[in-house]
A protein has these predicted regions:
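C-terminal amphipathic helix plus adjacent low-complexity
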Residues: 135-165
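A conditional alpha-helix N-cap/helix-loop micro-motif detector
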Residues: 62, 81, 151-154
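Nucleotide-sugar donor-binding patch of glycosyltransferase catalytic domains
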Residues: 63, 97-136
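Catalytic-core helical/loop segments in enzymes performing group transfer/polymerization on anionic/lipid-linked
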Residues: 39-40, 125-132, 149-152
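Donor-nucleotide binding loops and adjacent catalytic segments primarily
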Residues: 3-78
Length: 165
């Protein structure tokens, strides 16, 4: 289950910004800055994170009042995020590359990450490696571990649940 995507809005975001990465860590990330290396495109980020891009990338800080962050997520090629179920659902249902942040001692995140990796629908990086992210290495990790066909198993069950109620 996730918020309803707006295909027209997603297409408009893709047209305006081109290839993109969506990074959201919330306020629980211990870093003030994240450096992104080897990426040409747009980097969408949410409040609480300062992104420094070393290549020919454009950083777009989404205002806290952005009501449709899920459409930006769905318009992006890759999502780097904490392992909360809202973001996981949106990433899986939009069939995006999902890179989850391993946070030591957060058992629910660890269990989510391990299960999604086992299913071949996500990869992970350690929170301690967030200070500097090499997108070339991330893309290689994705290519080696995410099985695109496995993403087809997921659909938004909101309608099914409403019918049951």
């Amino acid at each position: 289950i996730c918020r309803r995507f707006d295909p027209d809005r997603i297409a408009a975001i893709k047209e305006q910004y081109g290839h993109s990465v969506f990074i959201t860590c919330g306020k629980s990330a211990y870093l003030n800055n994240i450096q992104i290396d080897n990426y040409d495109g747009t980097i969408f980020t949410t409040s609480g994170i300062n992104i420094i891009a070393t290549a020919n990338a454009t950083v777009v800080q989404l205002p806290v009042e952005t009501f449709d962050t899920h459409n930006y997520l769905a318009a992006s090629d890759t999502i780097i995020a904490k392992a909360g179920w809202g973001t996981i659902s949106e990433a899986l249902l939009s069939k995006r590359n999902l890179v989850l942040i391993e946070r030591e001692g957060v058992l629910e995140d660890t269990e989510n990450i391990e299960e999604l990796k086992r299913r071949g629908v996500a990869v992970s990086i350690k929170e301690s490696n967030l200070a500097r992210i090499d997108m070339q290495a991330i893309n290689e990790l994705i290519a080696e571990n995410i099985v695109r066909e496995h993403l087809d198993a997921y659909h938004n069950a909101m309608g099914d649940i409403i019918r049951e109620l």
